[in-house]
From Swiss-Prot:
Localization annotation: Endoplasmic reticulum membrane
Molecular function as annotated in GO: Glc3Man9GlcNAc2 oligosaccharide glucosidase activity
Carbohydrate attachment residues: 39
Functional note: Cleaves the distal alpha 1,2-linked glucose residue from the Glc(3)Man(9)GlcNAc(2) oligosaccharide precursor highly specifically.
GO terms classed as biological process: dolichol-linked oligosaccharide biosynthetic process; oligosaccharide metabolic process; protein N-linked glycosylation
Known catalytic reactions: N(4)-(alpha-D-Glc-(1->2)-alpha-D-Glc-(1->3)-alpha-D-Glc-(1->3)-alpha-D-Man-(1->2)-alpha-D-Man-(1->2)-alpha-D-Man-(1->3)-[alpha-D-Man-(1->2)-alpha-D-Man-(1->3)-[alpha-D-Man-(1->2)-alpha-D-Man-(1->6)]-alpha-D-Man-(1->6)]-beta-D-Man-(1->4)-beta-D-GlcNAc-(1->4)-beta-D-GlcNAc)-L-asparaginyl-[protein] + H2O = N(4)-(alpha-D-Glc-(1->3)-alpha-D-Glc-(1->3)-alpha-D-Man-(1->2)-alpha-D-Man-(1->2)-alpha-D-Man-(1->3)-[alpha-D-Man-(1->2)-alpha-D-Man-(1->3)-[alpha-D-Man-(1->2)-alpha-D-Man-(1->6)]-alpha-D-Man-(1->6)]-beta-D-Man-(1->4)-beta-D-GlcNAc-(1->4)-beta-D-GlcNAc)-L-asparaginyl-[protein] + beta-D-glucose
Gene3D superfamilies on file: 1.50.10.10, Glycosyl hydrolase family 63, N-terminal domain (2.70.98.110)
Annotated protein name in UniProt: Probable mannosyl-oligosaccharide glucosidase
Topological category with respect to the lipid bilayer: Single-pass type II membrane protein
Active-site feature positions: 580, 778
Cytoplasmic side of membrane: 1-11
Length: 808
């Protein structure tokens, strides 16, 4: 026996080993329980951010719900029914006042055209249930007795069904079942509000419209997302039938819109289901989702959850983002910060579908390759067989703008996860895992995730195709770096709660569930170990597909390998860089080396090196350290221009001799933004002076994307040719704060003065624009500071919260 071979004194070793193994089994069970509790806490959410109100689970092909509404005092406005968030809607500021993905929150929509202010409170309740409270208040200036029609709908995308039923009290509700959710019921409860009176007709007496209207329709599941189009078609058809029957010649002859534009009360066992409510003046009702096996939800429970959500949010915000002077005294600054962060967190979406992928790289490996003037039609490429519909995939992500960009963007996401990771570490890791699950066998991830027909409906045809050699700045590494920094900060501070000797924990404690991957060393190591192969594959894809050409054009530099070029340039754009129309070499050339891409690759390498060391991957760590050193050397050899005193792109002239292509701006500053320069560097001194020069990049509102002295400043599309972007200003401030203002040396004082003044300029400008308009903008004018382009852009513009709290 093994025990005999060990000897008497060593039997205790065997006993200890068995005890350890038993403990591991118990720990494993605990980890599974914790992961289930964590996943359950963010299973449901407003994960259809392209809609004003859309609740679904984080499950592919499952239950989809949404809310639509319109004023029905007349027929004209009904055609502009609210459903999907549209850039051109006559809606003022809309979005979340407070929101937490594990609890819920409150959204406010000022609908000027419909004359109504909608407050929607989404709350998560015990046993996985949820409720949506809808409160409508006539806006100032609108009739206090205006009539509003609202449609709540539900359908199942995959296996399962949902139907409408009527109980003995003549109350309509929905009931359904799916493999993932089991049996469930959705009910609505009117809490406040009067109802219009339908006019008398030949057949019916006038009556108060206090009952819900309802109907179910069998539609193809792949087209069920066109919900508002279906309702508009059906009720428009009903209106025409009535007109023909009664001989009405104009809309003026018709009965009031609120009495005509109603559903026919047809129950259905499956398909797309609607419950319609019609109110006069102010109203409130609850929509309640209940699992069949759980207790019923009361009005009081919903009200208490709403109040608790607000209280918990305010306390959590103060603990995570305590605002620093001069933003720590005024209530307005606090509301502003709450709104900015909530609308980032409320932009989370879960998407499933296929994408259109080109069969060939955009740049063929061909000596006769010519750079394109623009991009090709997706429909055309599909028709000619040069593109295909890739397999269906799912993505959990944060979208930059609900009305304009309701889909996943690779380079935006790294910025999105910086504040989210501070609030809820483990939730940010869920999104990281979701993105890296998209890494294909070659290591590629599409820069835009346009998954399915609903997502494609928001994207121009020429931008729908994804090319397997087009990259994007690898900003997800910023989020991973943030996680690593939190790990370092917590090492040695927290006991391992799984050892049986640590603190007690409860699976109902959301604060605990937010940070399991920090407090539990086993889980943190496992997360990084699972991610590391995907990171490496993705990294090697960058190295291979974006490598510069050192064979055709030799350079005098440390390494004949470490130089990179964004693929997919056109004459006017370099979409892969994320900086679209930022000036590059003209004409485009395969000889180019892009300084911003080398900077991103150096940062990518540095973070991967840390992960390799953390995991004990010594050989990989040594290789990465060698890459990083070569990259830093080549950054100086190939990209520093002594005359211009800036980092520049590199290309060749008509004689094939190397030249620098210098356009001072964000590209120039990126080595400093990513903390690649030593604190005592003379190069840093030059960049700091460039930043502070009012004739170049400095403005009272933030750092401009391109120098005012550049020939391309403010020209053409003028997207990245001067306008101020908050994500890039964040990188400047973050790097100054973390790397330079507290390090003694020749640059410390200048770095500190720039940091203090720039922080105030950026925050004050974003705040002032929000105070005047209630809107967070995509970018800000470089000469006036006025917000412009996409409104309701609460993606990386929300980094203003990190800046206010100096939480980098």
């Amino acid at each position: 026996m093994v025990s005999d071979m060990l000897g008497g004194n060593k039997r205790w070793i065997l006993f200890g080993l068995l005890s350890f193994l038993l403990n591991c089994v118990l720990v494993s069970c605990s980890v599974e329980d914790i992961e289930k509790a964590a996943n359950d806490s963010f299973l449901w959410g407003p994960y259809r951010p392209n809609l004003y109100v859309g609740i679904r689970p984080k499950i592919p092909d499952s239950l989809m719900t949404g809310l639509m509404w319109s004023n029905v005092d007349d027929y004209a406005r009904f055609s502009k029914m609210r459903h999907s968030a549209e850039h051109g809607d006559d809606i003022g500021a809309f979005g979340w006042k407070h929101y937490d993905v594990r609890r819920g929150g409150q959204q406010v929509i000022d609908d000027f055209l419909m004359g109504i202010k909608l407050e929607t409170d989404f709350v998560k309740l015990p046993e996985g249930n949820w409720a949506l409270r809808v409160h409508g208040i006539p806006l100032p200036g609108a009739p206090t007795d205006l009539t509003t029609s609202l449609f709540f709908y539900a359908y199942v995308e995959g296996e399962g069904k949902v139907g409408t039923k009527v109980n003995h009290a003549n109350h309509v509700y929905m009931e359904g079942k799916t493999p993932d959710l089991g049996k469930f019921r959705i009910q609505t409860f009117n809490r406040l509000g009067e109802h219009p009176v339908s006019p008398a007709s030949v057949d019916l007496e006038s009556m108060v419209m206090d009952k819900d209207f309802f109907a179910g329709f069998n539609v193809k599941k792949e087209g069920a997302w066109r919900t508002s189009e279906l309702i508009l078609y059906l009720l428009d058809t009903k209106m025409k039938v009535i007109s023909d029957k009664e001989g009405y010649e104009s809309l003026k002859d018709l009965p009031p819109a609120y009495s005509t534009l109603t559903l026919p009360n047809l129950p259905s066992e499956e398909g797309l289901q609607f419950i319609q409510k019609v109110f006069k003046g102010e109203f409130m009702f609850d929509i309640v989702f209940n699992y069949a096996s759980s207790k019923k939800i009361s009005e009081e429970m919903i009200s208490q959850a709403i109040d608790k959500n607000l209280q918990e949010f305010e306390e959590k915000f103060q603990a995570t983002f305590p605002l620093k002077a001069p933003y720590d005294t005024e209530k307005a600054h606090q509301i502003f910060a709450h709104t900015a962060f909530s609308n980032l967190f409320g932009n989370v979406g879960f998407f499933t579908g296929d994408s259109i992928v080109s069969k060939n790289p955009i740049e063929l490996d061909d000596e006769d390759y010519e750079f394109m003037q623009g991009f090709e039609s997706a429909a055309g490429k599909l028709a000619e067989g040069t593109a295909f519909h890739d397999i269906e995939r799912s993505l959990f992500t944060i979208v930059p703008s609900r009305p304009h960009f309701p889909r996943g963007f690779y380079w935006d996401e790294g910025f999105h996860l910086l504040p989210v990771g501070l609030w809820d570490n483990d939730f940010s890791l869920e999104i990281l895992k979701s993105w890296f699950s998209l890494v294909n066998e070659d290591g590629w991830v599409g820069r835009e995730q346009i998954l399915g027909e609903e997502a494609r409906s928001k994207v121009p045809d020429e931008f729908q195709t994804q090319y397997p050699d087009i990259a994007n700045p690898p900003t997800l590494i910023l989020a991973l770096k943030g996680y690593i920094e939190r790990l370092q900060e917590q090492q040695g501070k927290l006991n391992n709660r799984f050892s049986g000797e640590g603190e007690d924990y409860s699976l109902d404690d959301l604060e605990y569930l937010r940070s399991v991957s920090i407090s539990n060393p086993e889980k943190s190591v496992q997360f990084l170990r699972d991610l590391f192969p995907l990171l490496l594959r993705h990294y090697e894809w960058f190295r291979e597909t974006q490598k510069g050409d050192f064979e055709t054009w030799e350079r005098e530099c440390f390494s004949q390998v470490e130089g990179y070029r964004w693929r997919g340039r056109t004459y006017q754009h370099c979409l892969a860089s994320g900086l679209d129309d930022y000036p590059r070499a003209q004409p485009p050339s395969t000889a180019e080396l892009h300084v911003d891409l080398l900077s991103w690759m150096t940062s990518f390498t540095r973070s991967l090196h840390f992960v390799a060391e953390f995991l004990g991957e010594t050989e990989e760590a040594e290789k990465l350290a060698g890459y990083e050193n070569a990259m830093l050397r080549n950054l100086e050899d190939n990209h520093w221009d002594e005359e211009v005193q800036a980092y520049c792109d590199s290309s060749v002239d008509e004689y094939d001799d190397p030249i620098n292509v210098c356009h001072k701006g964000y590209v120039t500053l990126l080595p400093m933004m990513l903390g690649l320069l030593p604190a005592d560097s003379g190069r840093l001194t030059s960049l700091l002076k460039l930043i502070r020069d009012e004739n170049e990049l400095w403005s009272p509102y933030g750092i401009r994307s391109l120098s005012m002295n550049d020939v391309y400043f403010g020209t053409g599309e003028n997207y990245w040719r001067g306008p101020i972007w908050i994500n890039m200003n964040y990188l400047i401030l973050s790097s100054l704060y973390q790397n330079y203002i507290n390090t003694p040396g020749p640059n410390q004082n200048l770095a500190r003065s720039i940091y203090e003044e720039l922080r105030t300029n950026v925050v004050n400008n974003v705040f002032e624009n929000w105070r005047q308009t209630g809107i967070f903008w995509e970018q800000y004018d470089p000469t006036t500071g006025k917000g412009q382009r996409t409104k309701d852009f609460t993606g990386w513009t929300s980094l203003v919260v990190n800046i206010m709290s100096e939480n980098y």
